[in-house]
């Protein structure tokens, strides 16, 4: 490809709407252009990166026994109603009607579609296990699309679905996919961590892991242990319990706390530590109100609470709903005297003996509250977010936190969808059984953005070799120098003949402009054909990553660059 013919409109200024570095650089370097909020055109450079990522994904899926197909983007409402997700999915589901007023949706995911397909075409144990995948556009009506390709309304994903006879078969398929994902992200040149995760809206009762590309700009937070292999996202993370016996109980007392509504205000007013207070919260779980208690220095984990309750929808109660429970409203909520709604508490709360809690009266709190004596709970369970420094649940070493970008997730669905859509097979005895399912997603377009978040510098993108739009850029310093142009053309053609993806910058631009664009676009290897060609018979080779430079003879440069490419392709980042 010649740069004079390449459609890659670059920008010198950072677009105002671009908040994160990947969005800024993808726009500036001419990889994407905005069509509408959360929807993008992929220009030739961007498409080349996507194709490279998809090629790696396809190779690993095929090697693991996957078969590629393509499912429709428009899905009928009937199968979503059968699974129960038509109403549960909420406003993020793009819904539409055809001219006959029949309901459809634009697919955010394909569990229903693939289950319906397999149900109607696979019936025998002899056909299992079966692994089917596709790579296609997905749609999600994000309230506020942001961060470019990180959170858009249209995005590209690979989904593989496994169908097995039993849980043992599912586990085997799951581990195959887990290893395939490790291979994919290593081959893409990314530093990542697989972490334990909550299955979320996709559901299922089995395990789930997210694959997180480590980056300071990541939306997600992960908890991990350096001393062992434990890692989880914050929704799933646990720590080793640290409950210590409290002081001997004292009689509960009510004290005036006028206008002191927050934990910080109450602690300052009563001269107590946040760890000595009970944080009381009321939630609406589907149609019911519930109360959740954690220690005052902790943060509630709504995912853990939702899983404990088994509800479909969970949200914080409004002030009006809080006043249905307590005349004091949200600022003076407490568990003592509450009988109308169920109370759930974190184990740390139940170990307290002289706690401060709201008195359920305006301007008042209780001191010396003793759980079990002054109030009872329906259940005790881990309800809080883990903090850095707490002991690892596996080995006890201090936990650490890092930020990451989710680029893939694997799920053990079990029989959630096969049961809802009656996807069964006949076993060796002729008995009907539900297929046991797993699903495995890779965010292809998100992986492109995540790679930039992890691989950039002040000058632009620093693509890993395996997913770069081109492997080599050949730059003649002066288009007016016939010898330079002839040598650059010859090197370009020789590299192409050797199977190296090469871009020739044949534009009549100043050398400084060419070099600036080269750094912005981020092609891993740059060959500069300049004045040293005439004087010494050599060209300059520069690596985008690290900036290492060396000279090579015109005759040897192609072989040396090929060796460099092999070396970078084989390099494995530390996960």
From Swiss-Prot:
Sequence similarity: Belongs to the class-II aminoacyl-tRNA synthetase family. ProS type 1 subfamily.
Record keywords, A-Z: Aminoacyl-tRNA synthetase, ATP-binding, Cytoplasm, Ligase, Nucleotide-binding, Protein biosynthesis
Function: Catalyzes the attachment of proline to tRNA(Pro) in a two-step reaction: proline is first activated by ATP to form Pro-AMP and then transferred to the acceptor end of tRNA(Pro). As ProRS can inadvertently accommodate and process non-cognate amino acids such as alanine and cysteine, to avoid such errors it has two additional distinct editing activities against alanine. One activity is designated as 'pretransfer' editing and involves the tRNA(Pro)-independent hydrolysis of activated Ala-AMP.
Organism ancestry: Bacteria, Bacillati, Bacillota, Clostridia, Eubacteriales
Entry note about domains: Consists of three domains: the N-terminal catalytic domain, the editing domain and the C-terminal anticodon-binding domain.
Predominant localisation class: cytoplasm
Chemical reaction(s) catalysed: tRNA(Pro) + L-proline + ATP = L-prolyl-tRNA(Pro) + AMP + diphosphate
Sections of the chain in a coiled coil: none
GO CC, one annotated term: cytosol
NCBIfam families, per database record: PRK09194.1 (NF006625), proS_fam_II (TIGR00409)
Subunit annotation: Homodimer.
Gene: proS
GO biological process per UniProt: prolyl-tRNA aminoacylation
EC number(s) stated in the UniProt entry for this protein: 6.1.1.15
Subcellular location: Cytoplasm
Organism, scientific name: Heliobacterium modesticaldum (strain ATCC 51547 / Ice1)
UniProt-recorded name of the protein: Proline--tRNA ligase
One Pfam entry name: tRNA-synt_2b
Molecular function via GO: aminoacyl-tRNA deacylase activity; ATP binding; catalytic activity, acting on a protein; proline-tRNA ligase activity; transferase activity
């Amino acid at each position: 490809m010649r740069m004079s013919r390449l459609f890659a409109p670059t920008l010198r200024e950072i677009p105002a709407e671009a908040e994160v570095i990947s969005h800024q650089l993808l726009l500036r370097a001419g990889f994407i252009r905005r069509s509408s909020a959360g929807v993008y055109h992929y220009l030739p450079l961007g498409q080349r990166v996507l194709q490279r990522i998809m090629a790696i994904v396809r190779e690993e899926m095929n090697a693991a026994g996957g078969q590629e197909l393509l499912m429709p983007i428009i899905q009928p409402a009937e199968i979503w109603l059968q699974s129960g997700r038509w109403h549960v999915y909420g406003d993020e589901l793009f819904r539409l009607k055809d001219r006959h007023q029949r309901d459809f949706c634009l697919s955010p995911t394909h569990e229903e579609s693939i289950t319906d397909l397999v149900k109607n075409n696979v019936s025998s144990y002899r056909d299992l296990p079966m692994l089917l995948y596709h790579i296609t556009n997905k749609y999600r009506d994000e309230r506020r699309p942001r961060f470019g390709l990180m959170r858009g309304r249209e995005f590209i994903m690979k989904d593989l679905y496994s169908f097995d006879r039993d849980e043992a078969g599912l586990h085997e398929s799951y581990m195959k996919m887990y290893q395939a994902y490790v291979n994919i992200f290593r081959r893409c040149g990314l530093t990542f961590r697989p972490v334990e995760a909550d299955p979320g809206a996709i559901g299922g009762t089995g395990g789930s892991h997210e694959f997180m590309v480590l980056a300071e700009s990541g939306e997600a937070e992960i908890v991990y242990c350096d001393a062992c292999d434990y890692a989880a996202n914050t929704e799933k993370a646990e720590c080793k319990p640290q409950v210590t016996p409290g002081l001997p109980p004292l009689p509960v007392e009510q004290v005036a706390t006028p206008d002191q509504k927050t934990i910080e205000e109450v602690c300052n007013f009563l001269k107590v530590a946040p760890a000595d207070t009970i944080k009381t919260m009321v939630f609406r779980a589907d149609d019911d109100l519930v109360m959740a208690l954690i220690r005052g220095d902790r943060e509630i984990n709504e995912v853990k609470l939702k899983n404990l309750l088994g509800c479909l929808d969970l949200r914080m109660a409004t002030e009006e709903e809080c006043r249905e429970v307590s005349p004091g409203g949200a600022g003076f909520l407490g568990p003592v005297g509450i009988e109308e709604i169920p109370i759930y508490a974190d184990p740390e709360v139940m170990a307290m003996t002289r706690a401060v809690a709201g008195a359920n009266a305006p301007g008042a709190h209780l001191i010396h509250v003793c759980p079990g004596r002054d109030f009872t709970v329906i259940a005790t369970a881990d309800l809080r977010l883990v903090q850095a420094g707490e002991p690892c649940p596996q080995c006890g070493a201090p936990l650490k936190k890092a930020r990451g970008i989710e680029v893939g997730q694997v799920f053990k669905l079990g029989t959630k969808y096969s049961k809802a859509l009656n996807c069964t097979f006949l076993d060796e005895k002729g008995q009907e059984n539900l297929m046991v399912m797993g699903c495995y997603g890779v965010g292809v377009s998100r992986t492109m953005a995540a790679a930039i978040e992890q691989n950039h510098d002040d000058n632009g993108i620093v693509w890993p070799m395996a997913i770069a739009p081109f492997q080599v850029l050949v730059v003649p310093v002066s288009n007016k120098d016939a010898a330079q142009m002839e040598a650059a053309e010859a090197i370009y053609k020789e590299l192409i003949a050797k199977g190296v993806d090469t871009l020739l910058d044949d534009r009549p631009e100043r050398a400084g402009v060419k070099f600036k664009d080269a750094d912005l676009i981020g092609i891993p290897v740059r060959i500069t054909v300049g004045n040293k060609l005439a004087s010494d018979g050599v060209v300059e080779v520069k690596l985008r990553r690290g900036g290492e430079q060396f000279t090579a003879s015109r005759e040897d440069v192609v072989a040396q660059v090929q060796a460099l490419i092999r070396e970078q392709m084989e390099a494995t980042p530390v996960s």
